[in-house]
Curated annotation (Swiss-Prot):
GO CC annotations on file: cytoplasm; cytosol; nucleus
Region (Switch-II): 67-83
Pfam family, one: Ras
SMART domains the UniProt entry points to: RAB (SM00175), RAN (SM00176), RAS (SM00173), RHO (SM00174)
Single GO MF descriptor: GTP binding
Species for this entry: Schizosaccharomyces pombe (strain 972 / ATCC 24843)
Entry's Gene Ontology BP terms: poly(A)+ mRNA export from nucleus; protein import into nucleus; ribosomal subunit export from nucleus
NCBIfam families reported for this sequence: small_GTP
UniProt cross-references to InterPro entries, sorted A to Z: P-loop_NTPase, Ran_GTPase, Small_GTP-bd, Small_GTPase
Domain Small GTPase Ran-type: 6-170
Protein name, as recorded: GTP-binding nuclear protein spi1
Binding site for GTP: 17-24, 67, 121-124, 149-151
Length: 216
């Protein structure tokens, strides 16, 4: 079957501290993993993730750092022409959340006013350290937030759906078919996830704390 022409395609910049699960997350999408390309000059892997919506196909070219962030900052070439972003932290590691403002600053410095989703990964791990009430950065900066678990596929599609709606400018856009995902490596405790969702809802209703140095 011939590929439809002119599939809307967006550059998605995936950032966050090393070890937060960014590569694990992007590799869940099997066709994207199969079709990825390596850009040697920047040391990045670009994964084309296709999603089928009620308005046709959409593609995110997800730029993954391939671990460079562990060696220091990322070069501007990584961010240039980024049309949307995902900032990832690890809910079992407070320092990765504390560093979110630095990643956000880098993103908006180069990409300016793009839609960004903040994702707290590894919610399948029982020892959660970054609790819902501590996650306020997205509210201060008008980002979307999702708890995710890359290894279990929990909420995998949510960040992409939110970004697609923003980029296309249509809140009624829906994904009509699930992409082929790698089988879950871990199981999530549904009761625990329901509790987390409840805590997020309650936290969202609370007034924001005063600005503190950690979020500057």
């Amino acid at each position: 079957m011939a590929q439809p022409q002119n599939v809307p395609t967006f550059k998605l910049v995936l950032v966050g501290d090393g070890g937060t699960g960014k590569t694990t997350f992007v590799k869940r999408h099997l066709t994207g993993e199969f079709e990825k390309k390596y850009i040697a000059t920047l040391g990045v892997e670009v994964h084309p993730l296709h999603f089928h919506t009620n308005f046709g196909e959409i593609c995110f070219n997800v730029w993954d750092t391939a671990g460079q962030e562990k060696l220091g900052g990322l070069r501007d070439g990584y961010y240039i022409q980024g049309q949307c972003g995902i900032i990832m932290f690890d809910v079992t590691s407070r320092i990765t959340y504390k560093n979110v403002p630095h990643w956000w600053r880098d993103l908006v410095r180069v990409c300016e006013n793009i839609p960004i989703v903040l994702c707290g990964n590894k919610v399948d791990v029982k020892e959660r350290k970054v609790k819902a009430k501590a996650i306020t950065f997205h509210r201060k900066k008008n980002l979307q937030y999702y708890d995710i678990s890359a290894k279990s596929n929990y909420n995998f599609e949510k960040p992409f759906l939110w970004l697609a709606r923003k980029l296309v400018g249509n809140p009624n856009l829906e994904f009509v078919a699930s992409p082929a995902l790698a089988p879950p490596e871990v199981q999530v405790d549904q009761q625990l996830l329901a509790q987390y969702q409840q805590e997020m809802n309650e936290a969202a209703a609370m007034p924001l704390p005063d600005e503190d140095d950690a979020d500057l």
